[in-house]
Amino acid sequence: MKKRALVSVSDKTGVVEFVKGLLEQGIEVISTGGTKKLLEENGLQVIGISEVTGFPEIMDGRVKTLHPNIHGGLLAVRDNETHVTQMNELGMEPIDFVVVNLYPFKETIAKPDVTFADAIENIDIGGPTMIRSAAKNHKFVSVIVDPVDYDIVLAELKENGEVAEETKRKLAAKVFRHTAAYDALISNYLTEQMGEESPETLTVTFEKKQDLRYGENPHQKATFYKAPFAATSSVAYAEQLHGKELSYNNINDADAALSIVKEFTEPAVVAVKHMNPCGVGVGTDIHEAYTRAYEADPVSIFGGIIAANREIDKATAEKLHEIFLEIVIAPSFSQEALEVLQSKKNLRLLTINIEKATSASKKLTSVQGGLLVQEEDTLSLDESTISIPTKREPSEQEWKDLKLAWKVVKHVKSNAIVLAKDDMTIGVGAGQMNRVGSAKIAITQAGEKAQGSALASDAFFPMPDTLEEAAKAGITAIIQPGGSIRDEDSIKVADTYGIAMVFTGVRHFKH
């Protein structure tokens, strides 16, 4: 019996050449709507779906393949006598190949002017039903949903006259991944439209971007996936201009650096190591900002990741060229800067559209046996809600330093303390199990620069001991959430030493 293929695609990439190859193998082709029209326009002889179903395409194409003659031909088990007998009695013929991809729902809802009606109209019904039927019966049916697989199938047909069982199984698995991702997009879209923030089930879908050499350590396997609607201002959508392939750790660090530099509207440069900032500087131009970020910690920046929120010019590139760095991220690089930096063959250069998110996206964190979902911490300092419980208020310069430290401290692993002075960080204490321990690290790093600096703490002071350490170091202004039952003790210490202290009412833990 002559083999048959059913071809109905939204993405018509390569379909004419593929169908031509099927016809050359003596395979009869059934097609629908726009696909049939395209194939016939290219001189290929195909059978209309209505000739198989005996029923016209109706309701603007909503009903065309939902018919027993189609699904009987797909689902019949060819070595089951009962199935074969029923097919013969009902005049059905088997379908051996299904070439289908689905209505472009993702592309439709990505349009800024999409209406709800447009989105609904682009939910495919017949397509998923066909490919699921074919995939279930993959022992007898080859189902192709991705143009990438056209050449593989044709090559096996030409060489062996059939598609290998292992290939059919792989294609079937791809179908169910495809429909699961498709349904996830639809369910998430409808859930968002209804304003449901915590549905009873959560299905997420990501698209493979690249295999990585290894994970956090060489013995760990890793892959990088991107969200289907990831912000263009993200590592997932970065353009790599130069250098080695990004590693797992590179991607994590680049993401951390990008998150911090987005906090600033003025020219700013961030240096990151192990997802913590080691130096942050702002200035009148990007060269000045980089100089301050470097001077913040000229030791830790070695082998680090740099993110800038302005174009890298030649002068800045020459300074960057002086030390070993893993990555430099910027909105753009001047041609002269590229020529300087590309002389380092392994240095990764990334361009990213750097803009702060206008709304909080969801952050997913896996734990053993589950998944935590929360909003990203995008909250900025609101000066209308702060309070100043101390006798002295911050000076204009202290306010400037406090704001810089506060922008940075929310991105430092808790317990977090950041010291800032004169448009740059001068000390970062990260990840200690007690707050005073982080303060001591930041103060030690700052050294004599701590005198007259500002301190930011990501959470309140449970004891006044951190304030005592700050006072001994000559720190003159502090910003913290407040809210401890011992706030009065801290306020008394601050007043004793003439320290200005600001309560924000907002905590910025980061684990």
Swiss-Prot record:
Record bears the keyword Cytoplasm: no
A GO term for molecular function: phosphoribosylaminoimidazolecarboxamide formyltransferase activity
Catalytic function, reaction form: (6R)-10-formyltetrahydrofolate + 5-amino-1-(5-phospho-beta-D-ribosyl)imidazole-4-carboxamide = 5-formamido-1-(5-phospho-D-ribosyl)imidazole-4-carboxamide + (6S)-5,6,7,8-tetrahydrofolate; IMP + H2O = 5-formamido-1-(5-phospho-D-ribosyl)imidazole-4-carboxamide
Pathway(s) it belongs to: Purine metabolism; IMP biosynthesis via de novo pathway; 5-formamido-1-(5-phospho-D-ribosyl)imidazole-4-carboxamide from 5-amino-1-(5-phospho-D-ribosyl)imidazole-4-carboxamide (10-formyl THF route): step 1/1; Purine metabolism; IMP biosynthesis via de novo pathway; IMP from 5-formamido-1-(5-phospho-D-ribosyl)imidazole-4-carboxamide: step 1/1
Record SMART domains: AICARFT_IMPCHas, MGS
Gene Ontology CC, one term: cytosol
PROSITE patterns for the chain: MGS
Alphabetical GO biological process terms: 'de novo' IMP biosynthetic process
Domain MGS-like, first and last residues per copy: 1-145
EC number(s) per entry: 2.1.2.3, 3.5.4.10
Cross-referenced CDD domains: IMPCH (cd01421)
Keywords attached to this entry: Hydrolase, Multifunctional enzyme, Purine biosynthesis, Transferase
Family of the protein in this entry: Belongs to the PurH family.
HAMAP family membership: PurH (MF_00139)
Annotated NCBIfam families: PRK00881.1, purH
Domain notes: The IMP cyclohydrolase activity resides in the N-terminal region.
Protein name: Bifunctional purine biosynthesis protein PurH
